[in-house]
Every structure is written in structure tokens, then in C-alpha cells.
Amino acid sequence: DAQEILSKAKAIADEQGVEATTLIVTGDPASVFVELSRNYNLIVIGNRGKGGLAERLLGTTSSSLPAYAYCPIVVVPYTDDDGNLMHLNNTITKVAVGSDESKWGLKALEIAANFAAAWDAELDVISAVPNMKGSDDEGVMASFKDDLEVRIKPLEEAHPDLKINKQIVPGPAVGALTKASYDHDVVVVGSRGRGGFTGLLLGSTSQGLLQHAVGPVYVVPRKYVEAAETRLDTVPSSPAEVKPKALDDIKGVEEVPVSKAEPDVVEAIETKIDPDRQ
């Protein structure tokens, strides 16, 4: 089965002009992928809901790949909560980002703005006001709005032509961003692994944003951000300086050559992914 899956994936990559290396991972996939993330700028996970690789990689906040990876992670849903096949856009016109004052949230904001600018897309910045005593007070809401303006100002200066919409929403961050996934092409979030706006996004496999979003979620992990800001000897000074790890040194990874799937198989897969493709 693994060989067949890799064969199809390689054929699709070849069709798009992308050089692909095929690997088989054994053992605990989350641990292996964390080590593999040292070697890549981005990891993409297809999520088909309950069961399968994605559920083992996402896990809980304490064990998930997005919480501990060295590079950003994109989680792409295959079906919605009811098992219906998702149809994702091939173009990006609207980007949403969850924003708070943490360094993880600020990095997610920066990445989302660069992403939206590159695609000439709109950027919706969402700041959630937690349910707590006095949270509906006008002064509290005004404070959140002022804080959001401060965070957005550098983006407006860096991207003067970028259309930025600001939203202050009451209630849990998870609900606000899950809702945003219905009418945005991608949702960008930061992850520090626990607590705060970003920590709530992972949660358990039954409650987290990553399990209920109906569109791609781009996660900016804690280690990626910390590597970008620190000058300590124990942590590289930028994500680009995270030392890669040779495949031979990563237990549970084997590079395997595979034959390319037949053209009709590739066409059937691509048609299933995008029924409107020409």
C-alpha cells in the first residue's frame, strides 16, 4: 500500500514539474516528522478526519507535530465533519489569521500578510475576546481594538496596497477561526503548544481547529519562531540555520525508489481533487 501511495504521489509531482523524493516512515510518525521538519521549509499533511496518518501526527497539544515542528505545517482537510469530500480552491483570494500579542501570534500575522500580498488576496485579521467577566464592556472591547491597531500598523506600512480587514470577535478563538475557514482559502495561526489564543487552536483531536476547519490551516510552530529570534548557542539564530539531519540519522525513515503511476491513474486522482480542472 505504501509503495502504491508513493507511486501516485510521485506521478502527480512529476506532472507539476516538481522533483520528489519518496520516503517510508515507520514507528511513531509524529516523532519522526518532527525530526524531518529540520530539513524542510514546509510540511503539508492531508487530513481525512478520524484515523489515518493525520490523526496520529496531530494528536493532542502535548504530542502533535504542529506544536513541536521546526518548520511551518499546513493541514489540508479531505472531508468535512460529516464525511463529505472537500473541494478546495486552486487560487487564494482571502486569507484569515488569528492574532494575539504573543510572539507566535505576531509571527503568524507577519507570515499571513506576506502570503496575502504574494497572492494579491485580502487579509482578515481576527482577534478573539475571551469569555470572562467584563469582556462585553465597551472599555475592554476598545482596548482589544487599540491593541489590534498597534499590531497591524507595521503590516500596513510594509504592504500599503494590501487590503486588511480587522475583526474583534467575542468568544473562543477556536470557534472564530473554524468559522473563518468556511469562507477563506487559508487560515494562518501560531502555535506555542499550550495556553493563550494559539494554544487553544490545537486542543484535542475532537475539539481543535485542525480537526474541524473546512479549509487549509497554516500553523507557525513555536520552535520555528524561537529559532528566528534567539541568539543562544543552544538554538539557531534563524529558521534557516536549524541544522538539518541526515536521513540515515533519523530512526524510522527509509528512502525508497518507486515507479511512477500510469497516466490514467494520475488523471483520475487529479480529477477527484479538482473536478473543474481543464
Predicted regions and their residues:
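Short, solvent-exposed amphipathic alpha-helices that sit
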Residues: D1-A9, V32, I111, S143-R151
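Phosphate/nucleotide-donor binding subsite
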Residues: Q3-L23
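Small/aliphatic-rich secondary-structure junction motif
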Residues: Q16, T91-E138, E156-A158, K163-Q167, ...
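A structural preference for short, hydrophobic beta-strand core positions in alpha/beta folds
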Residues: T22-I24, V75, V125, K166-I168, ...
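Charged docking surfaces used in two-component/phosphorelay signaling
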Residues: I24-V32, I168-V174
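Gly/Ser-rich helix-loop-strand patches that form or flank binding pockets
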Residues: A30, E35-N84, S181-A228
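Short, well-ordered secondary-structure micro-motifs
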Residues: L85-H87, A108-L109, S135-G139, A176-K179, ...
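Glycine/small-residue-rich hydrophobic helix-like segments
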Residues: D136-R194, T198
